[in-house]
Amino acid sequence: RDFCLSRGLGDVYKRQPYSITDMKQVLSGFFISSFVEGHPLVYNSGIHLMTENCQSNGQAEVGFIGRVLLNAFNAWEYGHQSDREDLKANSMKVFDSYLKNGFTPVGFFKESVDFDKGYEDPVHSIRRQSEGIYAMLHFLAYEKENGRRHPEWEQKMKNMLDILLRLQQADGSFPRKFRDDFTIVDTSGGSTPSATLPLVMGYKYFKDKRYLASAKQTADYLEKVLISKADYFSSTLDANCEDKEASLYA
């Protein structure tokens, strides 16, 4: 590098950095190219894509890799900022489809649906459920700030936060995997921190102190089980290991 600079060879083409506006416009192409309709759920395809062609598939996932609802909110917000009617229209199709067809009988998100195989995963995860709530509370807060309300979505999120409280264990943890009837499939509490932020957001939005108390319990669990022991080991692929990525939320 020094050799090139000393001879005036540094960046011959005098490249200029792209502006934030330009980059957002380019990246927003994902919201259009990945948009999938024709199923009971409308979504942006973003899970298990083939790198050779990035062709959309029939897998719709709330949270984790798919982040269907968070993608919809990001597109919605950017659509308003940039006056993109196409993005706003697509985002609302996602929200409307999940409001109508995206919840289980109890009220959890249908977090992982594969329309290619006609399969809906009957086992829920605290991480995907939490990240779905997180996304929708961002949407509701944004809408409220701009003078718009969505009573049906507010009721759905209130119900979800209430049923999360039923899942919380005495030590403050949340089971990693569970079914719609609250049967616990995986008792490990490694993904507990993923629930902390949506609980705090729920408290801020709904002014319900129970959610803040629950969030504090998750923080206490995190401190006692993870931080004080300083035993971060293995990887997030290990179900018996704490989810470090999720803990960053807390």
Predicted regions and their residues:
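Single conserved hydrophobic/aromatic residue that forms the stacking wall/gate
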Residues: D2-L9, Y13
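Long, well-ordered core segments of solenoidal/helical folds
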Residues: R15-G58, D86-F109, W153-P175, K209-Y232
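Solvent-exposed loop and edge beta-strand segments that line ligand/cofactor-binding
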Residues: T51-V68, F115-I133, R176-S194, D231-Y249
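Well-ordered alpha-helical scaffold segments within catalytic/enzyme domains
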Residues: L69-E85, E131-R149, S194-K209, Y249-A250
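Short, flexible helix-adjacent loops and helix caps
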Residues: E77-H80, F103, A141-E145, Q169-S173, ...
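A structural signal for alpha-helical segments
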Residues: D86, E120, R148-E152, T183, ...
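Active-site neighborhood of glycoside hydrolase catalytic domains
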Residues: T192-K229, N240-A250
